[in-house]
Regions:
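Alpha-helical membrane insertion/targeting regions
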Residues: 1-158
């Protein structure tokens, strides 16, 4: 059960990331709304299967790992909330709110990207300091990318 849950969790996260990238570069609001809803569903699947994966072996995990996984569950819930906020803003169809939508989806993308980077570093048995550097670096790269996209959108509306 644990392996299946991890596979579905990871597949949902990867799909949400890919759709999120497509979303960021989509200019059609209706298409963004459809993609946004898909992101919400995929994040919900990601979260449910994360919880299943954790619960399937929680008693064998060290306390610190249980705390970290608890934090990841909270982060996943917040990511879902941000994706729902993006969909809510899109349903109002006000062009001036486009930057808010990019902020919400951008947060989700940065969180997913950071998760991929951290898991990869951990799987490669990188030392803790390197995992921390990778995590901070991934956030920095993500913020830079989202800000570039927002600047492009601002220039298009002028």
């Amino acid at each position: 059960m644990h392996t299946f849950a991890i596979v579905v969790h990871a597949t949902s996260a990867i799909a949400a990331f890919i759709i999120g990238i497509v979303f960021i570069f989509q200019s059609n609001t209706l298409r963004q709304l459809q993609l946004g809803r898909a992101i919400v569903v995929l994040l919900m699947l990601m979260e449910v299967f994360l919880v299943i994966a954790i619960l399937s072996h929680v008693t064998s995990l060290p306390t610190i790992t249980q705390i970290i996984f608890g934090g990841l569950v909270i982060l996943g819930g917040y990511m879902i909330w941000r994706a729902v906020q993006a969909v809510t803003v899109l349903t109002k169809q006000q062009q001036e709110n486009q930057l808010k939508v990019i902020d919400h989806v951008g947060f989700v993308l940065i969180s997913l990207f950071d998760g991929f980077a951290i898991v990869s570093a951990l799987d490669l048995q990188a030392p803790g300091w390197l995992v921390a550097v990778i995590a901070v670096g991934a956030v920095g790269v993500g913020i830079f990318g989202i800000n570039v996209r927002k600047k492009t959108l601002k220039m298009q509306t002028i």
